């Protein structure tokens, strides 16, 4: 893909497709959840995009084994005080077995929406503020940089997993650096229990060999008062201000990784 800016909403439906930017081609759009759908996107003057519909690039379930490299995928909408429905997704995948290398995912709220299993992100840059890595899928995010922003006066939450009980192990962040800007309160994440989920949700996330800044509260909390507490988050062999952080036993860690060993662990050198 030639280095240029490609403005619009794009959808991938083809399996075993490879798209590689020459250096860093940009795909960008500026829709948000509560925005009326534009005419060019099939709008009727009433319907809104919704969270899923706000994505600049969407990968449909049929597009398995997708490979993307050397791209910037951006939602350029900027949140405005008082607006309802500020979720602005840059990228959503609904397909399994995707590999994403050297991709910049840029947005604010709900940047990266992972809603399928067995996706692998390597050497990526991801930025946002509220729940900006989220979804029900299983994914490894390896050797990447994640930036937590301050947009308006809201707290920042790095991730919001809503892992299905039948899924493998939710999100794994490995060999990754977290950086931050602003003075807002920042949390590792919050467990998401969406209304209308197709099955029981047990949010799961693991941070392995991750370097955290001092201003991040190393907890995953519930999203709403009264939400269940049946979520799990683990921090292993990680650092915050030079202090080693571990909250899981080695035996449990080995069990946690069992599913990924054949497909992924040789790639991420754990």
Task: Provide a role label for each language-model segment.
Residues 2-267:
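Sequence-level preference for short, compositionally simple segments enriched
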């Amino acid at each position: 893909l030639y280095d240029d800016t490609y403005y619009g909403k794009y959808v991938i439906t083809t399996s075993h497709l490879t798209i590689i930017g020459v250096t860093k081609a940009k795909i960008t759009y500026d829709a948000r959840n509560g925005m009326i759908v534009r005419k060019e996107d099939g709008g009727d003057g009433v319907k809104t995009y919704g969270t899923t519909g706000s994505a600049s690039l969407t990968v449909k379930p049929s597009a398995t084994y997708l490979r993307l490299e050397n791209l910037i995928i951006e939602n350029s909408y900027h949140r405005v005080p008082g607006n309802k429905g500020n979720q602005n997704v840059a990228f959503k995948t609904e397909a399994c077995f995707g590999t994403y290398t050297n991709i910049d995912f840029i947005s604010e709220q709900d940047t990266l929406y992972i809603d399928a299993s067995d996706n692998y992100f390597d050497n990526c840059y991801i930025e946002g503020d509220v729940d900006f890595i989220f979804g029900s899928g299983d994914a490894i995010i390896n050797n990447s940089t994640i930036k937590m922003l301050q947009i308006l006066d809201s707290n920042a939450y790095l991730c919001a997993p809503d892992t299905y009980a039948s899924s493998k192990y939710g999100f794994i962040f490995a060999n990754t650096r977290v950086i931050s800007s602003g003075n807002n309160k920042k949390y590792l994440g919050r467990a998401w229990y969406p209304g209308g989920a197709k099955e029981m949700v047990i949010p799961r996330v693991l941070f392995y060999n991750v370097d955290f800044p001092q201003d991040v509260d190393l907890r995953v909390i519930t999203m709403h008062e009264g939400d269940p507490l049946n979520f799990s988050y683990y921090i292993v062999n990680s650092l915050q201000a030079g202090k080693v952080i571990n909250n899981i036993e080695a035996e449990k860690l080995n069990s946690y990784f069992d599913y990924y060993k054949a497909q992924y662990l040789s790639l991420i050198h754990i």
